[in-house]
């Protein structure tokens, strides 16, 4: 074994110098062959870098004036250019600048790749604000100088409108770290006035640009601070997922205290809250809602628990008067946002921020961040889903609060008009609110339907009901597994049925009024006629009741028949003629008018039992023995009267 090992060592010691010597040889043809077989992609980058290293170490040491040197430099420039393109595609712009500069700074031989690299470099110099390296300073440069002067003047005079000028400057030089940091500073100053989603999103975008384009030039502390700031704004202002930046922060330094505390806080809240899909995704809300059953626990956690969910000293670095976890969370959010405002990495605090009161910055909008509105929405949904009446009542006020801060002013006005005046909503309102927060739309619908119960029926009201009903049908909500959705659907159907019954009653009243007007008109034209009952007409049969039916049974039968032969049925039933249905309706009304009146009903019953009793068209015949409807004397022409004369 020792002999074999010794032999191998002897052979290796002989071959190694040969390998080292071979590696120092410039095999240009082999390097050119390798270059042709490679794609311009990230996977090929290490191979391009190896070829570039071979060229630099073994091939570019010869006399620059030698004949073979031009081929070496041409290959090197091609390799550098491809490396630069791959670096650009990976957002490594500063590295790409260094790579392209290797081509341009070689004065001996540039070739076509030298021109391409020069063009790329000039564009990158402008993007990064390296104006001292730009060859042709055109109108764009003049505008850059003008904007710079305007920005300096506005900053010195504390004019916050400078944000518009900085934004315009970033359109010229989007990756200039000095311009980006100035923009961040102005945005933070505005955020101290009002916690606004668009401002927070703009700050995050600027910091992400700096991380993407200037990562290599940033210190570890700066990178940690940036990831922390982005995480706070994403979580508690934008209500978006910050897990990527928290992981980045802790991967750089797992003991970084701010990111550790933030991660712990978010983790504890996520254990209580339902998933965002269950709250914000319409399909999950409507058809998978039964998967979450801890609605009572949510109300308990935020509004009833007597202990904070995390030790105040851990997250706030101070004690606080604890009322419940909802108000405690408000304090945490204020503290965290204040912290990122004060730290604002890379920014210089060029403006004087609003005064701090009671340890916190001015704006009341701390209470209206997207995250807190989201928590309000969770509590609202919990109030609708909880079987415990007391808990539900405790959480109910958060519905109106969440809705007020979720809707735009215009949409809020439309919602109020729908509630108070039953005005139909604009076409997009129902779908827009549904797609952003489905439970809030169901709360809106419930409020509108309950409010409209006491309102008079109108065409507007019918249009509003039809609009809501169409939305339910279009989205398949009649099949929802969410009990609150189904509660609203049943309430809507009940309201629609009430409206239909009201419409039927109105029609019948109008019909009776017309009949009464006609009768009054006839009475004015001719002497009133005595009741005329045709025993051939069976009013009981027409109404479908027995002769012993009560008044209540007669009325019920009548209402059912009026629904059946309502004018709306005329259009729906193509087999019956319009005149026939009107005739049927006339008989129904005639029968009901007689049988619903006790006196008329008695008279009708008597006429049916004694048909001859009702044979006189003008009422009962008067007992006048001297009146003969025929010709002559009523006792016959041969009858002789004897008056005792």
UniProtKB/Swiss-Prot annotation:
Cytoplasmic compartment spans: 23-190
Signal peptide: 1-22
Amino acid composition bias (Basic and acidic residues), ranges on this chain: 597-606
Record field: compositional bias (Polar residues): 607-625
Topology relative to the membrane: Single-pass type IV membrane protein
Localization terms from the record: Endoplasmic reticulum membrane; Nucleus membrane
Side Lumenal, residues: 212-645
CDD domains reported in the protein's UniProt record: DnaJ
Task of the protein: Acts as a DnaJ-like chaperone required for nuclear membrane fusion during mating.
PANTHER family given in the database record: LD25575P
Other comments on record: Present with 3180 molecules/cell in log phase SD medium.
UniProt-recorded name of the protein: DnaJ-like chaperone JEM1
Originating species: Saccharomyces cerevisiae (strain ATCC 204508 / S288c) (Baker's yeast)
Gene giving rise to this polypeptide: JEM1
């Amino acid at each position: 074994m020792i002999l074999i090992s010794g032999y191998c060592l002897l052979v290796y010691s002989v071959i190694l110098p040969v390998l080292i010597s071979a590696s120092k040889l410039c095999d240009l043809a082999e390097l050119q062959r390798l270059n042709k077989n490679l794609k311009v992609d990230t996977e090929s980058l290490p191979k391009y870098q190896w070829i570039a290293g071979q060229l630099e170490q073994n091939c570019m040491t010869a006399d620059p004036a030698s004949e073979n040197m031009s081929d070496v430099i041409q290959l090197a420039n091609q390799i550098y250019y491809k490396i630069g393109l791959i670096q650009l595609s990976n957002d490594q712009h500063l590295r790409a600048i260094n790579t392209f500069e290797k081509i341009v700074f070689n004065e001996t031989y540039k070739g076509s790749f030298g021109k391409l690299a020069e063009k790329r470099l000039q564009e990158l110099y402008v993007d990064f604000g390296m104006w001292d390296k730009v060859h042709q300073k055109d109108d764009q440069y003049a505008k850059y100088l003008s904007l710079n002067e305007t920005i300096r003047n506005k900053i010195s005079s504390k004019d916050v409108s400078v944000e518009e000028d900085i934004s315009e400057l970033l359109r010229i030089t989007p990756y200039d770290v000095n311009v980006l940091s100035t923009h961040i500073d102005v945005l933070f100053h505005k955020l101290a006035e009002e916690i606004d989603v668009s401002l927070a999103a703009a700050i995050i975008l600027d910091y992400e640009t700096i991380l993407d384009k200037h990562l290599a030039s940033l210190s570890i502390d700066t990178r940690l601070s940036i990831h922390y700031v982005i995480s706070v704004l994403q979580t508690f202002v934008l209500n978006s997922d910050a897990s990527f930046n928290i992981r980045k922060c802790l991967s750089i330094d797992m003991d970084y205290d701010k990111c550790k505390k933030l991660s712990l806080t978010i983790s504890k809240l996520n254990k209580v809250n339902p998933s965002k899909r269950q709250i914000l995704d319409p399909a999950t809300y409507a058809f998978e809602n039964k998967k979450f059953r801890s609605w009572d626990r949510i109300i308990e956690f935020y509004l009833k628990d007597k202990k904070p969910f995390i030790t105040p000293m851990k997250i706030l670095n101070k004690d606080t008067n604890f009322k419940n976890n909802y108000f405690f969370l408000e304090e945490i959010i204020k503290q965290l946002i204040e912290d990122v405002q004060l730290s604002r990495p890379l920014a210089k605090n060029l403006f004087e921020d609003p005064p701090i009161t009671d340890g916190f910055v001015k704006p009341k909008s701390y209470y209206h961040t997207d995250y807190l509105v989201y928590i309000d929405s969770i509590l609202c949904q919990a109030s609708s889903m909880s079987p415990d009446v007391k808990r539900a009542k405790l959480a109910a006020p958060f519905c109106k609060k969440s809705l007020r801060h979720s809707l735009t002013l215009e949409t809020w006005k439309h919602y109020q008009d729908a509630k108070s005046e039953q005005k139909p909503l604009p076409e997009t309102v129902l779908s827009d609110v549904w797609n952003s927060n489905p439970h809030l739309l169901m709360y809106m619908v419930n409020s509108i339907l309950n409010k409209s119960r006491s309102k008079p029926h109108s065409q507007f009201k019918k249009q509003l009901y039809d609009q809501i009903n169409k939305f339910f049908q279009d989205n398949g909500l009649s099949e929802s597994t969410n009990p609150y959705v189904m509660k609203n659907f049943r309430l809507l159907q009940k309201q629609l049925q009430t409206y239909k019954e009201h419409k039927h009653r109105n029609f019948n009243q109008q019909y009776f009024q017309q009949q009464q007007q006609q009768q009054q008109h006839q009475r004015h034209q001719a002497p009133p006629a005595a009741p005329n009952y045709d025993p051939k007409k069976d009013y009981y049969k027409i109404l479908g009741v027995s002769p012993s039916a009560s008044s209540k049974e007669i009325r019920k039968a009548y209402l059912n028949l009026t629904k059946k032969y309502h004018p709306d049925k005329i259009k729906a039933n193509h087999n019956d003629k319009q005149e026939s249905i009107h005739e049927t309706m006339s008989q129904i009304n005639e029968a009901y008018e007689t049988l619903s009146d006790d006196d008329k009903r008695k008279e009708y019953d008597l006429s049916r039992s004694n048909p001859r009793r009702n044979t006189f068209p003008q009422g009962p015949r008067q007992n006048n023995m001297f009146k003969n409807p025929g010709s002559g004397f009523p006792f016959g022409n041969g009858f002789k009267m004897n008056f005792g004369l």
